[in-house]
Structure formats: C-alpha cells, structure tokens
Amino acid sequence: MHEKYVPSDVESAAQGQWRAIDAYKTTEVTDKPKFYCVSMLPYPSGKLHMGHVRNYTINDVMYRYLRMNGYNVLMPMGWDAFGMPAENAAMANNVPPAKWTYDNIAYMKKQMQSMGLAIDWSREVATCSPDYYKWNQWLFLKMLEKGIAYKKTGTVNWDPVDQTVLANEQVIDGRGWRSGALVEKREIPMYYMRITQYADELLNDLEGLGWPERVKIMQQNWIGKSFGVNFGFPYEIDGEQKLLRVFTTRADTIMGVTFCAIAAEHPLATRLAKDKPELQAFIEECKRGGVAEADVATMEKKGMATGFTVTHPLTQEQVEVWIGNYVLMSYGEGAVMGVPAHDERDFAFVKKYGLPVRQVVAVEGKEFSTEAWQEWYGEKTGTLINSGKYDGLNYEQAVDRIAADLKELGLGDKQITWRLRDWGVSRQRYWGTPIPIIHCPTCGDVPVPEKDLPVVLPEDLVPDGTGNPLARSEAFVNCTCPTCGGAAKRETDTMDTFVDSSWYFYRYASPGAKTMVDERTDYWAPMDQYIGGIEHAILHLLYSRFWAKVMRDLGLIRFGEPAKNLLTQGMVLNETYYRENEAGKKTWYNPAEVTVSFDDKGRPVGAILNEDGQPVVLGGVEKMSKSKNNGVDPQLLIDQHGADTARLFVMFAAPPEQSLEWSGSGVEGASRFLRRVWSFSQANEAALRQGGTFDAAQLSDVEKVLRREIYSVLKQADFDYQRLQYNTVVSAAMKMLNALDSAKGARPAVLRETCSVMLRVLYPVVPHLTFQLWQELGYADELGSLLDAPWPKVDEKALEQSEIELVLQVNGKVRGAITVAKDASREAIEQLAAAHEMVAKFSEGKAPKKIVVVPGRLVNVVV
C-alpha cells in the first residue's frame, strides 16, 4: 500500500468499484428484514450546503450499519424541482426555469456522488418530470371525484402593477417585492383539499409515531382542537333579525365583553360601509394587509368604529361593532368578541382606542389594574366576578352554565373547532404542476380525461414578473372541451409545491410503475426512518400525513402514516462578521475573508477584513445562510480534505439532533485522525496481512488488554449506532486506534482480529478509506467485501478480568488505587486498603474508624 494517504485517490478508486458493481441498487427480497431510510429531498438550488452534507451523511451511516447487520436497506434520492426560486432565477438570468433546474440537478447529483453516498440512483425522482407530476394530476382528479378536492373563492395578495398574485413572503411592508406597489387582497376562485376532514385522525395518530415530541406538539398546536362555545349577538338591519356569530374558548368571560370586532371582508362590514367613505377606505386598507395568520400576529392592530351596535345575548346591553385588521375572515366566523380584561390582544386594542375594560375573573391575592397587562389576566384559574348569577363559578362551571343558557335562548351551544384550515393548492405561478381542468363556456369546469394525462407544462417559457406566462401561452391555454368538443381553455393555475413533496417516497419505492404506485411500495413503505430539518415540522410533514391517509382511503397503500420514525437533524452554525453603514445597512463577510484575534483563553476578541485590514464586527454564531454569508462550500472541503474527512467531521462534531458549530480546527482534527488510521495500517501491513490464529488461553497481558479494550468499545459503539448517536461512535473508533497503537508486541493474529473490528466500526462513517484498507490488508479475501461484511460480534470472554482496579479514598478524597482479585471478599479488600501506603500517609497514624467498600468501584478509608 502507498505510504501516504491521498484522499482523492482512495475515494476515486472506491467509488469506481462501487459503480462497476452497482453496489447500491436495491431490490425487494423476502429473506431479509427491510429498512427504508429517506432524507427529505432537496430543492435544486445550485450547490449542496453543509446542511445537506450532514443530513445525507446521517442517512448513509444508517444505511451502511444496517446493511452490515443483514438488512435489505434502501436509500433513494430525488429533487423537489418546482417552485418560485426557479422562476426568480429564470428572470434574473433570462433562461427558462427548466434549464436552470436541470443544470442544477446535474451539478448537485455529481456533488452527492463525490460524497460516496449509498444512493440507489435507479429510483431517482424529479418532481418537474411529467412522468412524476402526471400522478399529482391523477390523484387530484380522484380527490375531486370523492369531494376531497373542491373549488371556492379564496383571498390572495395581488400586485396591481405586475398583475400577479404574490406569495406571503413576497409582500414586504405591504408592498410587492418587485414592483414596490401597495398590495391588495383579492378574492379569486381556487382549489382546496379537505385536510380538515382528517383533523381528528391527524391529531390522534401522532401518539403512535416515533417522532420528536417537539414536532408532535407543533403539529398538535397547528391542528388546534379547541373546545368552546359558538354563539350570536342579535342585531337588526334593513328590517331583518340576524346574529353576529363568534366562537370563543373563553365563554366564562362573556360578561366582560365591551366591543365586537369583525373582519374587513365580513358581510356586515360591507353593508355598514355602504354610505361611509371612511369605512370603505379603512376596509380597503385592511385588504392590503397580509393574508397569513403570521402576518396578522405581528402587524400593528388597527380598528375603526362602525357606529353600529349588536345586543349582548345575556345582558341585553348594546355592544359597539368595530372593523379590525387583525380579524381574519378565513378563521372562525370572521368576528370576535372583545374582552380586554382577559385577552392581551383586546387589551392592547382598547388601550389604543379608549374603550372600556370590565374585569370579570378574579384570582385570589392578585390585584387587577387597567394600566398594564399582566399574564394572570388571561389565565383560567380564577373565579367569576361582576357576572351576575355566574359570580363565584370557576372556569369549567361558568362555561357549562353559560353554554346551557345560550342554548336555551337559541343563541348558541358548545362546539369543537379546529385551527386547521383546508389546504389551498392553487398557485398563480408558472413553474408547477398544471391543474388538470378545462374551462368550457358550455360545460363549465371539465376534468381532463385520464387518458389525456399528463397535462404537460411547457418548459420553454421565461417569466418576466408580470402575470403568469402560462396564461399568455396560447399553445397551452387553447384546447378542445373533452365533453362537447367545443373551443375551451385550460386552467393556468398550478399546484402548491407541497403537493409534489407529499408522496415522492412512495414513487421511489415503485420506479417506472405504470400506476401511481404498485406492490413494491407495500414492501418498502412506510418509511422506517425519515430525516430532515425542524423547519418542515408543520406544513410538509402534516401534508404528507394527510396524503398518506387519502391514498390509503383510495386503496393505493395499506397504511395511514408516511414515516414510523423521524429524525430532525440540528442546524450547522458558523461565526458571522459584518460592517454597518450610516443608514444601518449591514454588509456580511464570509469567515474565510476575515482574520480573528483571540485572548489568552482562546476567546475571539476582534477581527479584521483581510482585504483592507480594517475591523469588522463579530456577529456571533448563527445558522449558515446566504443572507449572513457565513456558509462553507462543501465542494471546497471535499476537494481539499476528501469526502471522508467531511463526513467524519459532521458526524463527530455533535449528536445528529443537535446544532453543529463549524470548526476549521475540527476539520483538521478529522483529517489528522484518518491519516493516523492509514499510517497505522501501512506501518503494520505485513503483520496485519500475515494474521493467523491464536489461543485465547495463551494471550499476553498486552494482548488481553487490547482485546478487552476493543470489544468493550465495540459493545458501546454498537449501542450508539442503534440509538443514532454517531458522534460517540467516532469517539469509539478513536479509542480503538489508540488501543491498537499502544499494543506493542501483540502478535499479528491478535492485531489482525482487532484491526478488523476497528475498520468495520469506522466504515459506515468513513466508507472510502476503510473500504480501501479492507482490501489492501486482505480482509476482503476472508470476509468478503466490506459493503456486506458481517458486523463484528462482541467476544464476551475477552471482557472478563481476573483482577479489577478500585479507587482508593481516604476520608472521601481520592488518594490512589488498589488492584484486587475480581472475586475478592470485602474483608480482603479492607485489609489491602488499610495496609496501603497512601492510607498511612494521610491518616497521620490514626487507626481507621471504618472502611466503606463500593463493589467494583471504590474503597473509602475513614479515619
């Protein structure tokens, strides 16, 4: 073997062999247990980042460990290829999104292959391929037939200059990101999916999932099952008796209502603004605000009195009606009761507009003040006051009594509501799955016949930011009605890209199938392990769970959850550096452009920009991102140190679920360790290749210690592999190398046995180096390729010791150690301890009062 470790040569050779035998192509077999591990498919943005490297290495380590343990393992890969970033890049570069996307896929695939990942590329999926999105369209039509998909009007952000719909993130301070125009809210017809139909099941099935508790809680909160009361405030308008309906989880505070607020889109708001220009103007202002719940939570709360009142259902008092920009028509009834004494948002609203505050819940020992909000105001722990016949009741009692009274009056009743809303899947964008609907002036909306699927998206259009290019493509839009044969037009909306990512893992399992999925999906799915970032905890993971239940109900799959287990890997962090100009604008500099100075304790105290030698501000450690310019290009790392070093570093630096802080010295350390592994193998090549056999009863002390250390560490490493604690697995391999390095005089047969254990423990993390050494040292001739070499078994006899070492304490302080027979009696241990020279030294001639023995651990002499 070569004297020097050259990562590029080693990795090229290993990958060449794997390609030659199609090492990771996987089929369905019945004589092995299966394991299906999937990393969330990436968006083809152009280059891999360190977060990708970490995610895919975790998956790869899992794959290799399980394959060595006799599992039939599948690790596929694909591309979440539709979406708005491709359109933006296309505009910036004046190229079709398709070209930009396919070029990026080719480059990123090459990067993944350079990492040596155990991916079965025969199952590769790109969601922008007609062969894939045909099944988005097919399932959409099936859902339309079953009433799971339906059409209704929905509110969107409309840019009046660019004449296009904007996503929420494209609205900045109420203006279009590109045109700068004030954004309007518009009602347009869109398609929705009845995810609310599955709300109970989505909530209840969380319990059986091996997912992080944090993710489960986030989904529970998003689904948001609420027990409350739905009731109405009576009013009369235009000679008609009506009810202003609200839903509340705090019916106990109904006697504290001092106003009601309605959404700008509420029918009552429209009616009340009929002859009031000020109200009309305010309603238009509200409509220009964000349409997302997150926008409403952070925006300034504004309101305008309508001059109209409704009647309190229990007190008959007149209650003012306001229009509020924080009330969404799409949530609840589009109206809320205002109880400022016990709701923080209402409290802030009335402080701004001078409305009354009426306390109706008291907590013993706490004093209420209208001057400032206190957390306890909103708690359910008190009893009612200022509430007439309900005074003295606690929360549960009050809700029951008030709900019963409202029901008796015919004005309300208890109700379960959900925060979850149906999923709007229409997007007024070009680069997405075309919705398979034809609009006929005679027949109305006509589904595209199954035989005509897929409706193929033209790939040669270039967006210019003004409207949807599809709507301007006559070749796409103009068609024939499949029902009457007359001239018709295609739907130009495309599907939300979350549709694409809701089922790709089933298509991996059925590559080339003539149906959406086939029996191979039943073999592989559900996923045994899914790996991805916590940022996908709600939308992607919730939609994929919904999709599984729909596909199950349509008879396509036999299960209702996509993934048994979920690992949310931590973020990759790095230092940030910036300068700020007079206007407050920050310019961020990459760590590679900066030289940092440290104090005598190694803490950073300053930094300068290499280009001009002037100071930059230390911005602290943050997630690697383009916006903070603190990313590290994985390709540079691989080119300089090799893929194995990159893999070793990202596995060793932190447990998979925790954040990983980038460290240049850590990378150097990983590279240095791999060079040590190579050097040890090269220096001992002759002995390791010689091998032979040995009699365990005739081992030297050095050999006993070596085998005991190797198998003791193997036992822990095996446990750590099973619980996905790969950082401590790397520590185990380091301990093994230290033990081998220290075993001077050990015979070749013992060295060969123990080195084979180390190589196999290290292999899942560092596959190229270990694969090469396995061959160079002759292990492949004996045990077969390292790809399928048997996982080493712990030799329990090697762990047995005739003697053990106990910590020696005098008056509770460690003073040394004593070696005793493993089966030594308590009396023998006490005698040895009492006679030890360190006891004589620290007892000052005093006789021991007592000797405490903790079996297997320590002995404490008390004087």
UniProtKB/Swiss-Prot annotation:
Keyword Signal on entry: no
EC number: 6.1.1.4
Keywords per UniProt: Aminoacyl-tRNA synthetase, ATP-binding, Cytoplasm, Ligase, Nucleotide-binding, Protein biosynthesis
Disulfide links within the chain: none
Motif ('KMSKS' region): 623-627
Annotated GO MF terms: aminoacyl-tRNA deacylase activity; ATP binding; leucine-tRNA ligase activity
Annotated catalysed reactions: tRNA(Leu) + L-leucine + ATP = L-leucyl-tRNA(Leu) + AMP + diphosphate
Listed transmembrane segments: none
Residues that hold ATP according to the record: K626
Sequence motif: 'HIGH' region, positions: 42-52
Subcellular location: Cytoplasm
Main location: cytoplasm
GO cellular component labels: cytosol
HAMAP family per the UniProt record, alphabetical: Leu_tRNA_synth_B (MF_00049_B)
Family label: Belongs to the class-I aminoacyl-tRNA synthetase family.
PANTHER family: LEUCINE--TRNA LIGASE, MITOCHONDRIAL, LEUCYL-TRNA SYNTHETASE
Protein name: Leucine--tRNA ligase
Annotated source species: Paraburkholderia xenovorans (strain LB400)
